[in-house]
Amino acid sequence: MNEVMVIKEGWLQKRGEYIKTWRPRYFLLKSDGSFIGYKEKPESTEHNVVLPPLNNFSVAECQLMKTERPRPNTFVIRCLQWTTVIERTFHVDTPEEREEWIIAIQTVANGLKNQVPEDEEEEAMEVKYGSPSDVSSAEQMDVAMSKGHPKVTMNDFDYLKLLGKGTFGKVILVREKATGRYYAMKILRKEVIIAKDEVAHTLTESRVLQNTKHPFLTALKYAFQTSDRLCFVMEYANGGELFFHLSRERVFTEDRARFYGAEIVSALEYLHSRNVVYRDIKLENLMLDKDGHVKITDFGLCKEGITDGATMRTFCGTPEYLAPEVLEDNDYGRAVDWWGLGVVMYEMMCGRLPFYNQDHERLFELILMEEIRFPRTLSPEAKSLLAGLLKKDPKQRLGGGPNDAQEVMSHRFFVSINWQDVTERKLTPPFKPQVTSEIDTRYFDDEFTAQSITLTPPDRYDNLDALESDQRPHFPQFSYSASIRE
């Protein structure tokens, strides 16, 4: 096992992802790809006896971009986290300093790429389910390759309805021609992930597919590429977004909220046990399947499409759901998911968001400072649960301790819940969607389902067989499929 070494260290200005101020951070770039930032220069890096970092992410398989806006000598690190594009923005004082950082980061990223053993690339492994993945846990993931399986292309599907669209791509309801099964296909434009003339950006299966299986997580069936797109084919839950149902009914009973909350907790416990933080719990990411059980989706597309004019950097994330530690640009762990659970359960039981203001600056202030308030109609157990989940300090938050999900599961609000029955889908859903078939999209937004499907340009459903792998160097390994058809 190679010893992890510090390759480069020094002060960088890091731009906040939500509150867009620049904050000085002392960063260490390590040989394992970790890129960690501190408020102060760590006193000692010997024996790794240092305070926990404020920022901690991986530069493995990242794309690097230089820009002179909004400040001179800025650089952006962009990578794909599961199927969502994320960016981090930094600036330094001189072009020479920026060049040093870029070369160091690129050298580390290239070194990691070369460490993938060839026999691992050849091996076909069974993957039943995929789930949102933390970029830093690539080594822990099982992979599935298309070798030994028929190649999947865009021609294998009928394109039925547009389910969502955003800055980086769109999600379409498709039918697999061979099986008649319905899926949601998330299509990302490569150009937003790789710029022309930039360093090759490789997507390996270990990054994208994780061998996870859970009843309340959306499964990934296939991933493949065309010359200009990346395509993720995911399980399709057609009972509608919880957001859709809640907006119709305004508020759910505590029993109904308890049912959905328990299924979300079960899924989060599963992800956390695999060192994956979901980070994006919000009503729009919670679907119901045809039986009325929860499915946590990964259709994230930066729906807002709000772009910062200076950097053309897209604002991703629904600000109402952001946890205080995310706003403060501190590194965040599993507790961020318990905050997200608190927000969605508050919405379900109270019929409104815990913190809201149209002005984002004011909203962020409320999230960071405002005390939570409850309607009089709420039971003491519900108030206690929500107050615990919505604690500002992640260390004090319910679920924020070492016992993680167990703290939430043992809260008295869930006293009537048999957690084994939850995971085995034995609880009767409080609402069964009125869908007549798998293709019934009555619970999806008319704004999308009424639109016709256009993939521009329409004639570029590439025949990938005509493209030799060396002609598409950016994504040489990007095609695989779950090896079992259910």
From Swiss-Prot:
SUPFAM superfamilies in the record, alphabetically?
PH domain-like, Protein kinase-like (PK-like)
Q: Provide the residues annotated with a glycan attachment (glycosylation).
A: 133, 136, 311, 318, 479
Its BP terms in the Gene Ontology are: positive regulation of protein targeting to membrane; response to peptide hormone
Task: Identify the catalytic residues.
Answer: 280
Provide the binding site for ATP: 163-171, 186
- Entry GO CC: cell cortex; cytoplasm; nucleus; plasma membrane; ruffle membrane
What is the residue range of the signal peptide feature? none
InterPro entries listed in its UniProt record: AGC-kinase_C, Akt2, Kinase-like_dom_sf, PH-like_dom_sf, PH_domain, PH_PKB, Pkinase_C, Prot_kinase_dom
UniProt name for this protein: RAC-beta serine/threonine-protein kinase A
Whose protein is this, by species? Xenopus laevis (African clawed frog)
Lineage per the UniProt record: Eukaryota, Metazoa, Chordata, Craniata, Vertebrata
